[in-house]
């Protein structure tokens, strides 16, 4: 229901949603007018028939919340639907590798980009997502490999599939990451030719406006959209303290599969607590409010084209 809601919300406001880890749901595809298909190092859920239905492809090299490492999905969350999507056994912890198994360097990345272009008949852009670490070098390598766009994901990003020490202490923050990525593209003569998408810690229209002012062409939100869905919020159906031993607002139980509001779970009883239509409206309202904040800031700077 969460992925359906995000797809519907993106369609309502005219932007794109992303499949994220583990493949595409047909219901998600039907809800999303514009869908970005992620290609992960693990290849979990990868399906060429789904790939060709996307409006863009995103090769994930790293994530800002856990750069240089893979991920771990606890077995309690690997129920039938997830296991089917990922073609793996139910109830078993699923570990994602830190790198793509079929390429070792930038030359192989260029080959992979070419393969994805051929698979999609050259119809859609191919983006590369980088965790913000060696930003200058990594952005240059991705741009030279032929990426149409580069997603620079900062350390302020979130994840439910990594150690707390990595989430809190590894990577580079959003502002310096954008500046370094912009200058890397400028040195190659590719600034404004290769799209720069900022993600990680974008929580408001002000954050988005700052990112664009620093040189990003677009922004992506993750945690903010989950909060708009109702993440960490007490609802009539939920009882945080009784169900997970934590109070609303301090949940941090995404990895358990017991999300009281029905977002980070596959339990049918919990999933039913999230109405996809109502949730989509909340997310759409949030994105519209971000847009209005950006417009206000832009107008205050004397710019007439918002």
Sequence positions of predicted segments:
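N-terminal capping/small domains of soluble enzymes
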Residues: 1-82, 86-97, 108, 277, ...
């Amino acid at each position: 229901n969460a992925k359906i809601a995000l797809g519907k919300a993106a369609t309502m406001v005219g932007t794109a949603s992303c499949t994220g880890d583990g493949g595409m749901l047909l219901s998600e595809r039907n809800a999303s007018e514009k869908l970005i298909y992620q290609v992960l190092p693990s290849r979990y859920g990868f399906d060429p028939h789904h790939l060709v239905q996307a409006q863009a492809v995103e090769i994930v090299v790293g994530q800002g919340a856990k750069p240089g490492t893979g991920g771990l999905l606890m077995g309690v969350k690997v129920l039938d639907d997830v296991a089917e999507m990922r073609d793996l056994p139910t109830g078993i912890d699923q570990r994602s590798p830190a790198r793509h198994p079929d390429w070792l360097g930038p030359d192989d990345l260029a080959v992979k980009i070419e393969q994805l272009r051929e698979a999609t008949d050259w119809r859609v852009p191919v983006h590369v997502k980088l965790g913000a670490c060696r930003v200058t070098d990594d952005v240059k390598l991705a741009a030279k490999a032929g990426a149409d766009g580069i997603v620079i994901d900062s350390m302020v990003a979130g994840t439910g599939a990594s150690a707390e020490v990595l989430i809190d202490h590894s990577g580079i923050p959003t502002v310096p990451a954008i500046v370094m990525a912009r200058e890397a593209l400028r040195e190659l003569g590719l600034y404004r030719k290769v799209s720069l998408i900022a993600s990680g810690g974008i929580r408001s229209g002000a954050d988005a406006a700052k990112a664009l002012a620093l040189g990003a062409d677009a922004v992506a939100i993750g945690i903010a959209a989950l909060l708009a869905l109702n993440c960490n919020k007490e609802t009539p159906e939920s009882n945080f303290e009784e169900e997970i031993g934590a109070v609303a607002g301090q949940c941090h139980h995404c990895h358990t599969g017991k999300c009281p509001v029905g977002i980070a779970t596959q339990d049918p009883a919990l999933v039913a607590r999230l109405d996809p239509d109502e949730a989509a409206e909340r997310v759409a309202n949030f994105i519209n409010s971000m847009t209005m904040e950006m417009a206000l800031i832009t107008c205050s700077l004397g710019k007439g084209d918002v």
